[in-house]
Regions:
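N-terminal export signals
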Residues: 9-30
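Catalytic cores of extracellular degradative/oxidative enzymes
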Residues: 470-754
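Acidic (Asp/Glu-rich), glycine- and aromatic
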Residues: 75, 176-180, 189-269, 447, ...
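Low-complexity, Pro/Ser/Thr- and charge-rich linker/hinge segments at domain boundaries
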Residues: 222-228, 369-391, 448-491
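Short Pro-Gly-centered flexible turn/kink motifs
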Residues: 67, 344-362, 935-942
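Acidic-aromatic substrate-binding/catalytic surfaces of carbohydrate-active enzymes
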Residues: 40-41, 56-173, 226, 232-241, ...
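Carbohydrate-binding surface patches
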Residues: 808, 812-908, 926-940
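C-terminal beta-strand-rich structural cap/linker in extracellular carbohydrate-active enzymes
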Residues: 363-365, 922-949
Length: 949
């Protein structure tokens, strides 16, 4: 029988044995798979994660329903755990001092605590003088009152399945509760959910302004806990996370025993979705239920000592009903958060009652139903919340009553249509002029919910502007640069309006790493769709004078860490790399970017003939050798890389060129990598403790090699990263990565989810994928400046820092993913996503507006159109006879011949008509059409004899 191990024993026992295994056991044995050697590590990994985390806790009492088990800690009056009943893994969704070691209970922020700030009156506030000659004097000052510092007045009772906590009297502690009586209870509801009731009563003799009233939601999300050992080294450095003996175990524990929480904070329809990163339903939902409970802001409590000794964990999120005092105390007055900040004023003896509800839901779609049943709004937005000017966005609002009023909180908002259909209000919105576009929905006798969109300019124009900006503002021309960055690319700082050459993190300005490859990566891929001779010339100059001369060794194909370096001082931080450190070539991630740059140049040469320094085949061979170096370099060679999926396209182009030996060699390297993905239960690790980078490559490799089960599991994990489609532009379709939004993972993982949708028809995967891909375009300004990401933290809420940094990877993902989708929606009928759709009888006219106008999918027919040379201006598809009319154009002036590929056709013979020519062509389901651009204004494709493929 397997011996049970505690969490700390687990890592202690791996210890030295793990280190020996890392050094001496072949990769396959470390990572798993058939024939793996038995080791102390493997014996531990073979335990179920439930056994591994079995802990005994005291002071606990329990409430059970048919669906959940909740335990409460009498010492703190807090919720200690929520588990699904009969859950095979036994995961605790709530954070406590066992799964979040190092917290300080004397200043607690448990789930069940209350965080408040009240206005301490020192005089008559109504007598304030604010006239012309008056001297204004504040009537008092803010004072924090915290249940976590009110243990001296805390009373806890448990009886009859009711857990009650009362704070009665005045706490003697500095930040204890004194101004109000607080009473809370947790009890099961008839529907097997858990209700949390809160009542506050003003016990002062005067009016009481509560400027902050927030509820910590402490969940079991301290991932860093798995990387620390008492008495051992203080931390496992995130940039040296190469302990592959422990990595599968850590990933197993993270995905099965830790949770991820997604928040929608927008009024009465707010919610928190807590789920395992594994992505398996049911999920734990927390949401408001009554008239007075509406969340307006969410933030960390920076004043708390609760988490200061919990290494790597920033503390729980505070879900705030009122946050005016928080705004003032933290200096957000010039940068308030999206919903505004309010106070509540209580007269002496006046009470307020709040209620929240914990319930397990069986699907993401079920979230909307739970909110609807609570009298709030079930919200669905199609297709995204980052929206181009003058394109429609569709909003479905499921509610028990009609929406009373829609208030515009921003300029240039248009409601094109509004109608009530059953229990749903359907809106068709559009926007003009860049910026956040917010609406407030009023309903249900005083309830409200805010929706925040973001309007951007025409994407095609933005992409072309970005390419021009890179060439004109970021291409570095300095033959005297001592670091050999001449004809490389530098990042751009929007604050000073200039590229910059120095950074405390040398790789940021060193022409390698994600920051250094960002600009040429985007520029190369962009020119594959919109070729511009000047930009291609710059790319070839960059390769010749910088990349394939100084960054990459042209003989060994090794890629160095940075061209830039610094002489270290006693006070130098880690990022001040020495010359020796900058010359290191072991970071696997640095190989994928140049491989993709070379590959794009190969395709540019093949399609447009714009190359001057090398032949197209030369670039493909450089890409191939860089891929081989990638799969042999450094410790992360068999971990998913950002943009790693493109190895599949490189491989296919090598095959088309007839390079059989190179094809077989690269195929074998990729297959070995995929074997690790399949054998490792959770192959989603990286150089960081927790990351969203590996998933894209894992998804596409397992799909390519036919590993259906791991591919399905990866889709499930990808969807968990995005949660319940939280309807705010900075969360919709975005992976939960703290408060970082619209980053590269939004588009790269979105690309995978869109592929999953095309394979399966999963509408939820479509929404998560499409919205994520669109979100990165918010980062590009009309002049071509491109931010790296957006920070949605209250008080920040901007692109911080406002630099380009790694922006190119996210835009690369957009370019790979952009497509016009024509689909039948269950609510809105025929919908164009990334395009405008018009119908006449059985004929569908599509005018693409997806940014590229290169790809199109009729989802019901599973018909794909791709124009690799030229652009679709208009497409007419007649469902009655299966004919297609393609109207093409070239916005670049560099396309000599239009190239179109159709996939998903019925087998048979087709008549092609264009210009003054026509011909017949057989199709096995795929049809390739090449037409001189001068004759491509109108191409007609008609089936003559067709059979179902």
């Amino acid at each position: 029988m397997k011996r049970k191990l505690s969490r700390r024993e687990l890592f202690k026992n791996v210890g030295a044995a793990g280190a020996v295994t890392l050094l001496n056991v072949p990769l396959g044995a470390q990572q798993g798979g058939n024939g793996r050697q038995s080791s102390p590590f493997q014996q531990i990994l073979d335990h179920s994660s439930k056994e591994l985390l079995a802990e005994h806790e005291q002071y606990l009492v329990k409430i059970q329903t048919a669906k959940l088990i909740a335990t409460f800690d009498r010492r703190y009056g807090s919720l200690s755990s929520i588990r699904r009943k009969n859950d095979e893994l036994g995961t605790n969704y709530i954070g406590n001092e066992t799964n979040t070691p190092g917290v300080n209970p004397s200043d607690s922020r448990w789930t069940g605590d209350v965080v408040s700030t009240v206005w301490r009156l020192l005089g008559d506030w109504r007598a304030a003088k604010i006239g012309l000659h008056d001297i204004f004097k504040m009537s008092g000052e803010w004072r924090r009152e915290l249940s976590g510092q009110s243990g001296d007045i805390r009373h806890v009772e448990f009886r009859d399945n009711l857990f009650q906590v009362r704070y009665d009297g005045q706490s003697a502690n500095e930040h204890g509760i004194r101004s109000y009586r607080l009473e809370m209870s947790f009890h099961p509801a008839e529907d097997h959910s858990l209700l949390w009731d809160i009542e506050i009563e003003n016990v002062t003799p005067g009016v009481l302004e509560v400027g902050e009233l927030g509820f910590p939601l402490m969940v079991n999300d301290d991932y860093a806990e798995l990387y620390y050992e008492p008495g051992g080294q203080s931390a496992i450095s995130t940039i040296n996370n190469v302990d592959f003996v422990r990595t599968p175990l850590r990933q197993k524990l993270i995905h099965e025993q830790k949770v991820i929480v997604h928040h929608f904070i927008g009024g009465h329809s707010s919610y928190a979705l807590v789920q395992r990163p594994l992505g398996d339903a049911p999920f734990l939902l927390l949401h408001p239920t009554n008239q007075d409970t509406s969340f307006e802001c969410s933030y960390k409590d920076q004043d708390s000592a609760f988490s200061e000794h919990a290494e790597g964990w920033r503390g729980p999120d505070i879900l705030a009903i009122h946050s005016r005092a928080t705004k003032i105390r933290r200096g957000w007055t010039r940068n308030p958060w999206v919903n505004g900040h309010t106070s509540v004023v209580l007269q002496p003896g006046e009470k307020k009652n709040y209620q929240m509800r914990f319930v397990f839901v069986d699907s993401y779609e079920a979230i909307r139903e739970e909110l609807y049943q609570a009298g709030n709004l079930g919200i669905r937005v199609l297709p995204s919340m980052v929206v181009q000017e003058d394109t429609e966005v569709l909003v479905e609002l499921q509610s028990k009553s009609e929406i009373d009023k829609i208030s515009f909180l921003s300029d240039n908002i248009k409601v094109a249509s509004r109608k009530r259909s059953g229990d749903k209000t359907l809106l068709n919105l559009s926007f003009r002029k860049r910026g956040q576009k917010s609406i407030k929905l009023h309903y249900g006798d005083g309830r409200w919910t805010n929706l925040h969109f973001y309007c951007i300019e025409d994407i095609e124009t933005l992409l072309k502007a970005r390419g021009k900006f890179i060439v004109e503002r970021e291409f570095y021309d300095n033959p005297e640069d001592p670091y050999h960055r001449h004809h490389g690319f530098l990042p751009f700082d929007h604050r000073v309006g200039s590229a910059y050459t120095d950074s405390e993190e040398v790789w940021e300005v060193g022409d390698s790493d994600e920051a250094g490859f960002s600009e040429p990566l985007f520029l190369a891929e962009k020119n594959l769709y919109f070729p511009r001779e000047e930009e291609v010339d710059v790319l070839e100059t960059y390769v010749n004078d910088c990349l394939f001369k100084y960054i990459q060794n042209p003989t060994t194909f090794e890629v160095r860490a940075s061209l830039y370096w610094k002489e270290r001082l006693p006070s130098s931080p880690w990022g001040n790399w020495t010359k020796e450190r900058s010359e290191a070539t072991w970071r696997t991630y640095n190989y994928v970017h140049p491989a993709n740059i070379y590959h794009a140049l190969y395709r540019i040469g093949k399609r447009y003939g714009l190359l001057k320094r090398r032949k197209a085949e030369d670039y493909l061979r450089m890409s191939y050798h860089t891929c081989i170096a990638w799969f042999h370099a450094g410790p992360w060679k068999h971990i998913g890389m950002m943009e790693g999926s493109n190895a599949i396209h490189i491989l296919e182009d090598i095959k088309r060129e007839g390079w059989q030996q190179e094809y077989e060699t690269l195929l074998q390297e990729m297959k070995e990598c995929d074997d690790v993905f399949v054998s490792d239960p959770y192959p989603y690790s990286s150089e960081l403790i927790i990351d969203q980078t590996a998933h894209e490559q894992v998804y596409f490799f397992t799909r390519y090699f036919g590993d259906q089960e791991k591919n399905r599991k990866t889709v499930q994990v990808l969807k968990a990263l995005r949660g319940g489609n939280q309807p705010a532009w900075f969360r919709y379709g975005n992976d939960k990565r703290g408060d970082v939004c619209c980053w590269y993972n939004a588009s790269l993982n979105g690309m995978a989810l869109l592929s999953a949708f095309e394979d399966s028809g999963d509408q939820d995967a479509f929404l998560k994928g499409y919205a994520g891909v669109m979100s990165v375009m918010r980062n590009v300004l009309p002049d071509g400046m491109g931010f790296n990401y957006f920070i949605c933290t209250p008080g920040v809420f901007s692109s911080d820092p406002p630099t380009t940094f790694e922006s190119g990877t996210g835009l690369w993902g957009f370019l790979k993913s952009a497509k016009s989708y024509i689909l039948n929606d269950k609510t809105f009928g025929l919908v164009g996503c990334g395009c405008r759709v018009e119908t006449t009888g059985q004929a569908i006219t599509v005018i693409p507006k997806d940014g590229l106008r290169k790809r199109m999918r009729f989802t019901e027919e599973k018909l794909d159109l791709e124009c690799t040379q030229g652009e679709f201006k208009k497409v007419i598809f007649d469902r009655a006879d299966g004919s297609l009319e393609l109207q093409l154009e070239d916005s670049t002036g560099n396309v000599k011949s239009a190239a179109i590929t159709l996939r998903g056709l019925e087998k048979g013979e087709y008549k092609l008509s264009y210009g003054n020519s026509s011909k017949r062509s057989p199709s096995d389901g795929t049809l390739v059409v090449n037409v001189a651009m001068s004759e491509a204004r109108r191409v007609r494709i008609e089936p003559l004899r067709a059979t179902k493929s």
